[in-house]
Each structure stands twice: as structure tokens, then as C-alpha cells.
A protein has these predicted regions:
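Polar/charged low-complexity regulatory segments
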Residues: 1-155
Length: 155
């Protein structure tokens, strides 16, 4: 049931798309081909810079560990390159989105559908950390030392 298509990645905002892509990547990294892995990490690092990418990875690792250890049932995910999203992925993305927006009760309610209720608050706290690290602030652009991929103009 949690794998039934409920929408498309293109219908989500960037944070929600990234949350689903991270979930898929973490779930499939052992079987994803090397070129696909390099492209995934290159794109994320290019967008965020090295420091924020590391923070996002650490926060997401907490989320994924909670989901693996304490999930109420197996969380269904689509293939890494699939354009549609499943019900569980949608729920997951909404937890991240609600956590970012400070709507913690809504995030907690959805989190308790994915993990055992006593661990839902930990999932929401980790979701807030992930959202903060993966969001690029318009008033706080990447600093030069943060991004290995930053370009420089000579003239």
C-alpha cells in the first residue's frame, strides 16, 4: 500500500524532492550503479557546498537509522530514477516539509505513521536538522570555502 503512486516528484518543492531522493539513495545505494551515485552526490554538493552536504548526510543518516530500526512496517520506496512517488515517500517528504515549516504537531502525526510512536519525536528532530542543512538560504549564499565546485571569474 505504501508504494502506490500518489503523485510525481515534479509536483513537490525542492526540499521534498531532495528528501525522497535521499531516501531512495540510502535504500538502494548497495545496488545503485557507481555512475549514478557519483552524479547524485555531485549534484547535491554542487548545490549545497561541501559543509552543508556533510551536515545533510549526517542528519539524514539519523533519519534513515530511525526508519530502519523502528519502522512500523517496511517503508516502500520507488526506484532511484522513478518520476512518480509512493504514499510512504509522500508521507516522508511531508514530515521533512512540516518540520522545516515549524509545524511540529503535523510532522509528529505523520512520523508516528512511519515509526513507532515513541520514536516519532526523534524522527521529527532529525528531520528539522536535515531540512536546515539542505535548504539554501537566499540571504546566506554559499561561502567560497564551502564549495569545491564554486567557479571564479578572472575578468
Amino acid at each position: 500500500r505504501g508504494g502506490a503512486p500518489v503523485g510525481y516528484l515534479s509536483e513537490l518543492n525542492q526540499l521534498e524532492q531532495n528528501a525522497i531522493l535521499f531516501l531512495r539513495y540510502w535504500s538502494q545505494c548497495a545496488k545503485a550503479d557507481h555512475d549514478l551515485q557519483n552524479k547524485f552526490w555531485s549534484n547535491i554538493t554542487y548545490d549545497l557546498g561541501i559543509t552543508k552536504t556533510r551536515q545533510a548526510i549526517d542528519a539524514f543518516d539519523e533519519i534513515f537509522t530511525l526508519c530502519v530500526k523502528y519502522s512500523r512496517r517496511p517503508i516502500m520506496k520507488h526506484d532511484l530514477e522513478c518520476k512518480c512517488i509512493g504514499g510512504d515517500e509522500s508521507c516522508f517528504a511531508n514530515i521533512i516539509g512540516f518540520a522545516q515549516d515549524g509545524e511540529l504537531e503535523d510532522a509528529l502525526l505523520l512520523a508516528s505513521n512511519l515509526v513507532a510512536p515513541k520514536f516519532a519525536s526523534y524522527l521529527v528532530a532529525s528531520a528539522r536538522k536535515f531540512a536546515a542543512s539542505i535548504t539554501i538560504s537566499e540571504c546566506n549564499p554559499l561561502e567560497a570555502e564551502e564549495s569545491y565546485y564554486q567557479s571564479y571569474s578572472l575578468h
